[in-house]
Regions:
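Hydrophobic packing and interface segments
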Residues: 1-733
């Protein structure tokens, strides 16, 4: 079923891609500056593209194996929909394409931002922010284009006459969910690989350059400087983009599947269709309003950090207010039942995103007390810096967790008509809250991608000796970027929590389809009741599979899910440690063997450091990524559906809290160091500074590798469970 209002969705995605192209061409018209600026930028660009090429080779080999597996399951054993292998490939392809285009833009934008900062602060902000907007608009444009393409395709190819009319939309939405696994798999490799790369280079550059040799950050004498700048792009542009692409698509697809399920029992295809299309329309209008917000961002010369933050906030807040108002109009025009309260669920999602962002800023910005206390602890040595940072990270989990808890309850109650027994509509409300949170992704991701562009611009200005005034401007842009990056991580974690919950609910729908595919038509309960599977509700399946805390299989799954979060963090932290060790050895070797590096008479071998980070990341990212894919499959085969539900609950709850803790502790350590570098507590080179450098070095893999990767672990385990639902139903012990 497709009505005229549906076509707004593909049109909005094309509009996003058109504006992304416009901003890219606008950026490319700017001058890159001096020959040295161009040369430094080309080093970073070549390193970034070299890394991405290697990463995509590894990912391609994993995709080949998984596509063969899915094809056997679909065409050999018939426990999966035949569209799954193709859907999986398109999800991975578009996610990879979004990362590639975003990173390509970022590597061209850094020198142009530095050169624009020679003119004015506002000029530098405009170039960096609109280059970041390319990433934001490419992600939402490709994501919504992929979703609308699959809806149109499946609507055309899945026959009406062979199925109950309401069952057709259930098949379409659950099949579309599977391309989310392709996006999730690609995102995990991008996040883990990019995180290991960037932190191996960063830790190596800091330990030997700052601590041992006493040279400043981004100094061209440091052999790991280029690798460090490359890492900003592969981790914070390609990695963040793939992460949020996955959340964006996952939230829309899960909500569409929940909408189809909520109205199956009504027998009305029209009501079902409206619930399926609503999240897509909200996302489509969000794209248009994000573009308006992007044009609203501008600032004055000599602006302070708070004024720069306000400039970005004007854009994001304008988009958020407009989407809040528009949502009610969309749902009313669409003719949704209970349209006002479902609209309130969308507002809840927006508010949860804002609260998590503000809480993250409070705990990680040097403008506020928590980070300043961590900075002050540097006066008594590195041990107290580590202790205070860990304490801050643990305390910082309270507000995000409470925000998500309140958001879940409110969105459930609003959509269900304040009836806790109306589980189908309540879960739809949680899904639509996740869509609401991500509806302004076009501009919120622009502020995230802006960070590494500004960071690289500062590095370029430092290496090219552009003068104090230019460095002052790039430092201001860089400081703003650090805050937006920390806030962006909080936003990504919060969106992962709500999306993960929506995916968990969608898993039950996939179980329903798996049973029907096996020829099962009726659920026979122990009390003698029987219900048609096609008409069974979420609650019916919970009772049928005995998903209660008294079931040992559920408890076993919960413990395994909690363990997975910590194992995953342990593997990625150790991976950074090993890769950083190789980088430290290489930087020390160059300082020792290449005479004249420290005096500036000889050029370091930048390419060798880039190569070490690339190889380290490729080698180390495979084990944690494969573990995340295998865990739900094995749990399903051994403990069945109940065990998988427990695994997803344990992974979601533990992973969310652990991710907030790691991201905020790492962000606080980073900005505590920067606070001292501004001249506080003795300034650069003091004992307090050296202590906070140690804290920052420990915090690097916290905030840029393990913490952000947990977002994807939460969603990927749910996606794998959904795709493998047929296997679990057919062959579990």
């Amino acid at each position: 079923m497709i009505t005229s209002i549906f076509w707004i969705i593909p049109l909005a995605s094309v509009l996003a891609l058109a504006f992304a192209w416009f901003f890219f061409r606008q950026m490319m018209k700017e001058s890159e500056g001096t020959e040295l600026m161009k040369k430094i930028a080309s080093f970073v660009r070549e390193g970034a593209m070299s890394y991405l090429k290697q990463q995509y080779k590894v990912v391609a080999s994993v995709f080949v194996v998984l596509v063969i597996l899915f094809s056997i399951m679909a065409y050999g054993f018939h426990v999966q929909n035949e569209w799954v292998p193709i859907a999986f490939l398109t999800g991975g392809f578009f996610s990879g394409l979004a990362g590639f285009l975003g990173m390509k833009t970022a590597t061209y934008a850094s020198a142009r931002t530095a050169n624009a900062a020679r003119t004015s602060l506002n000029k530098g902000l405009q170039v960096a922010f609109r280059s970041g907007a390319v990433m934001g608009l490419v992600v939402v444009g490709l994501g919504l284009l992929d979703i609308s393409f699959w809806y149109i395709l499946l609507n055309a190819f899945i026959p009406d006459e062979a199925l109950d009319p309401t069952h057709k939309l259930t098949i379409i939405t659950t099949t579309m969910l599977t391309f989310g696994m392709g996006a999730s798999t690609q995102a995990l490799f991008a996040r883990v690989g990019g995180g290991i790369y960037t932190k191996a280079a960063d830790v190596g550059a800091d330990l030997v350059g700052k601590v041992e040799a006493g040279i400043p950050e981004d100094d061209p004498r440091n052999p790991a400087t280029i690798a460090d700048n490359v890492g900003d792009n592969v981790g914070d542009v390609a990695g963040m983009g793939a992460d949020l692409y996955e959340s964006y698509c996952g939230s829309i697809l899960a909500t569409a599947a929940l909408g189809a399920a909520a109205f199956v029992s009504s027998g009305s295809v029209e009501l079902q269709y409206k619930a399926v299309v609503a999240p897509m329309l909200i996302a489509a209008v969000g794209i248009i309003l994000s573009i308006i917000g992007i044009f609203a961002v501008r600032t004055n010369e000599n602006a302070t950090i708070k004024q720069l933050l306000k400039a970005l906030a004007i854009g994001t807040n304008l988009s958020s207010v407009l989407i809040a108002i528009s949502t009610f109009g969309i749902l009313y025009v669409l003719g949704m039942e209970n349209w006002f309260w479902i609209g309130c669920s969308v507002i809840v999602g927006l508010l949860v995103g804002i609260v998590i962002g503000q809480a993250t800023e409070y705990y990680t910005s040097q403008s506020y007390k928590p980070t300043r206390l961590v900075s002050e602890s540097g006066l008594t040595g590195p041990a107290t810096v580590i202790i205070s940072g860990l304490g801050l990270g643990m305390l910082s989990t309270a507000i995000p967790v409470l925000a998500v808890v309140v958001g879940i309850i409110c969105s459930f109650l609003f959509a269900s008509g304040f009836d806790f027994t109306n589980v189908g509509m309540g879960l739809y409300g949680i899904g639509i809250a996740a869509v609401g949170m991500l509806s302004t992704l076009g501009i919120t991701l622009a502020t995230d991608a802006y960070g590494p562009i500004a960071d690289n611009a500062g590095g370029n200005a430092e290496m090219c000796n552009l003068g104090k005034e230019v460095r002052k401007r790039t430092d201001a842009l860089d400081s703003l970027g650090n805050t937006t990056a920390a806030t962006g991580k909080g936003f990504a974690i919060g969106s992962a929590a709500l999306t993960g919950l929506a995916l968990l609910a969608s898993y039950v729908e996939e179980i329903k389809i798996g049973l029907l595919r096996l020829g099962e038509n009726v659920l026979n309960f122990t009390d003698g009741r029987s219900i048609e599977i096609s008409k069974a509700s979420f609650s019916d399946f919970m009772v049928y599979y005995d998903v209660t805390l008294m079931n040992p299989k559920v408890l076993a799954g919960m413990f395994l899910g909690s363990m997975m979060a910590f194992m995953f963090c342990g593997l990625t932290m150790n991976a950074v440690g090993r890769a950083a060790g190789h980088m430290v050895e290489e930087v020390r070797r160059q300082f020792k063997e290449i005479k004249g590096i420290l005096t500036g008479e000889a050029q370091p071998d930048y390419a060798r450091c880039v190569e070490i980070s690339t190889k380290g990341a490729q080698h180390e990212m495979v084990l944690p990524s494969v573990l995340a894919i295998i865990a739900p499959i094995l749990t399903g085969l051994i403990f069945g559906v109940t065990g998988v539900v427990g695994l997803l609950i344990g992974g979601l709850s533990t992973g969310f809290v652990l991710a907030v803790f790691m991201a905020n502790a790492g962000g606080a350590w980073d900005n505590a160091k920067k606070f001292i570098e501004e001249g506080n507590h003795g300034g650069k080179g003091s004992e307090a500074h050296k202590a906070t450098v140690v804290g920052d070095t420990v915090g690097d893999p916290f905030k840029d590798t393990s913490g952000p990767s947990l977002n994807i672990l939460i969603k990927l385990m749910s996606m794998v469970a959904i795709v493998m639902a047929g296997l679990t139903v057919a062959w579990s012990l």
